[in-house]
């Protein structure tokens, strides 16, 4: 009997290892070419430079799209060892998110196995490893990337609470609660489930069990507390203002806003599972998943208390963002992605358990695998990311060095916002810049390429126009370059020094 159990465990771990290797390949294949480098990643580089080079410990990360609210610094600090490993190159950030992606696969396997069965854990890890949606999520070097990792451990905490393991549960909640500010403010919505779960557990709260959780949330929230005290509770006021004052969404109101949220949630579910499967709309897929949830409820396959929590979890997100005044993006709803993975995993597990319908489960997983791989390999690679931006700045450095220019000026022919995401490379490659108008050679970056703009060098979708070298006198260039490096002194949108 023991030998049989050991063989099963060994088999499960081999399957998990294979899943991890597939997931690792999908997250590292063409790592540089598929690195979506833009302003957010540029800001991360400046944060890390500020800490590592300038020895300035920071309490906040970049400013969010809501004025006065900053993301926490934890994700940025996590990138530091990877930046050091890559000699301060931003590619180091991709190593971190790859590691976090693998950690999420293992976490899903562990948590699903604890709540249900190891087969459910393997199915969940497989879905996360292969899904085009989660693969892309794990390639984005942004603080919101670990949302699904946070969610799976929050689910674990809820399960602990249902089993009356309050001390462990509140330790988990304490750590996760403090990390919300560092990852995504929308995760705070899930905290409503804690008192609901406590009620469903049928056991009263033992206050002594809160101690470890309170200590954990204090430690993880310490940067926020220090920042708020130093800055007159700036973020607290900004959060209150954002929740009580209409902001930027004048396009969708009332029922239209609800439709918008439902559409985005349906789009996320479709992206999570369907790959290039052509015959189902976004809304059709969401209806199928609701039908699966109802099936699991009717058949009593999942603990009714856990199912109740799952439904409440979904409804909280739908109703909150249907009434939220700000324009809602898809990633705001990533906090419920783990629910869709869980639902699908349990459903497939039920199919695989029965020999008469097992082939349907195998067929669905096979289609899932094929259509998601097809989308991954047929996806058009962004031609204005890490490789192209670094190459453009490298070309400016090469050409200016060949001409003996002590510094350069840089202009942009592009839409507002697309001129961002280059400055860290100018620092990394040691290119000194000066303001335009200082009689300094002006290099012009063009995006996107258009026939009316004749470029000298193209890197992907980004072009470069050289200065008219003959029109710049050496003495005037030296005088124009005698000041400070404007790349280091000019304000940087979203970054506070």
Name every feature range the model reports, one short phrase each.
Residues 17-20, 215, 348-375, 385:
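Signature aromatic-anchored transmembrane alpha helix within multi-pass, membrane-resident enzymes
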Residues 23-26, 124-129, 177, 181, ...:
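Short helix- or helix-capping micro-motifs
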Residues 33, 45-54, 64-65, 161, ...:
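Transmembrane-lumen/periplasm boundary regions of multi-pass, lipid-linked membrane glycan transferases
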Residues 95-115, 153-157, 292-299:
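Transmembrane-helix motifs of polytopic, lipid-linked glycan transferases
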Residues 115-116, 154-170, 180, 199:
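Membrane-interface transmembrane helices that cradle and orient dolichyl/undecaprenyl
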Residues 133-146:
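Short acidic/glycine- and proline-prone juxtamembrane loop motifs at membrane-interface regions
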Residues 138, 307-353:
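Hydrophobic/aromatic-rich transmembrane helices and adjacent perimembrane loops
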Residues 361, 366-481, 486:
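Catalytic lumenal/periplasmic loop and adjoining terminal transmembrane helix
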């Amino acid at each position: 009997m023991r030998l049989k159990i050991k063989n099963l465990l060994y088999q499960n771990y081999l399957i998990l290892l294979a899943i991890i290797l597939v997931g690792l390949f999908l997250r590292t294949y063409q790592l540089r070419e598929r690195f979506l480098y833009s302003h957010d990643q540029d800001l991360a580089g400046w944060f890390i430079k500020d800490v590592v080079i300038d020895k300035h410990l920071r309490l906040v990360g970049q400013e969010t799209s809501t004025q006065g609210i900053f993301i926490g610094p934890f994700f940025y600090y996590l990138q530091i060892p990877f930046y050091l490993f890559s000699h301060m190159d931003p590619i180091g950030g991709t190593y971190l998110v790859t590691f976090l992606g693998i950690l999420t696969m293992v976490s899903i396997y562990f948590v699903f196995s604890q709540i249900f069965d190891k087969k459910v854990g393997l199915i969940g890890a497989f879905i996360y490893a292969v899904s085009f949606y989660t693969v892309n999520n794990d390639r984005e070097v942004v603080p919101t990337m670990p949302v699904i990792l946070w969610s799976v451990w929050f689910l674990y905490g809820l399960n602990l609470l249902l089993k009356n393991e309050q001390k462990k549960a509140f330790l988990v909640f304490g750590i996760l609660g403090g990390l919300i500010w560092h990852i995504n403010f929308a995760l705070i919505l899930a905290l409503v489930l804690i008192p609901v779960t406590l009620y469903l557990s049928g056991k009263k709260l033992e206050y002594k069990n809160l101690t470890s959780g309170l200590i954990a949330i204090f430690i993880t929230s310490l940067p926020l507390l220090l920042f708020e005290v130093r800055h007159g509770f700036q973020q607290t006021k900004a959060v209150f203002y954002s929740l009580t004052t209409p902001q930027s969404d004048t396009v969708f109101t009332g029922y239209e806003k609800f439709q918008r949220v439902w559409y985005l949630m349906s789009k996320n579910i479709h992206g999570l599972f369907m790959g290039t499967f052509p015959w189902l709309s976004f809304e059709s897929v969401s209806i199928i998943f609701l039908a699966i949830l109802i099936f699991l409820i009717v058949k009593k396959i999942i603990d009714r208390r856990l199912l109740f929590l799952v439904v409440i979890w979904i409804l909280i997100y739908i109703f909150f963002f249907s009434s939220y005044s700000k324009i809602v993006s898809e990633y705001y709803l990533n906090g419920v992605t783990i629910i869709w993975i869980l639902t699908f995993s349990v459903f497939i597990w039920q199919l695989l358990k029965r020999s008469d319908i097992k082939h349907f489960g195998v067929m669905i997983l096979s289609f899932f695998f094929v259509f998601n791989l097809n989308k991954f390999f047929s996806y058009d690679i962004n031609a204005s990311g890490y490789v192209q931006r670094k190459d453009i700045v490298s070309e400016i450095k090469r050409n200016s060095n060949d001409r003996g220019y002590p510094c350069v000026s840089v202009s942009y022919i592009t839409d507002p916002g697309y001129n961002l995401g280059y400055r860290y490379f100018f620092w990394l490659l040691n290119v000194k810049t000066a303001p335009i108008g200082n009689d300094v050679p002006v290099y012009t970056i063009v995006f996107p390429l258009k026939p009316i703009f004749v470029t000298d060098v193209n890197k992907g979708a980004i072009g470069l126009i050289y200065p008219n070298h003959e029109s710049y006198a050496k003495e005037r260039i030296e005088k124009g370059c005698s000041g400070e490096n404007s790349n280091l002194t000019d304000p940087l949108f979203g970054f506070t020094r």
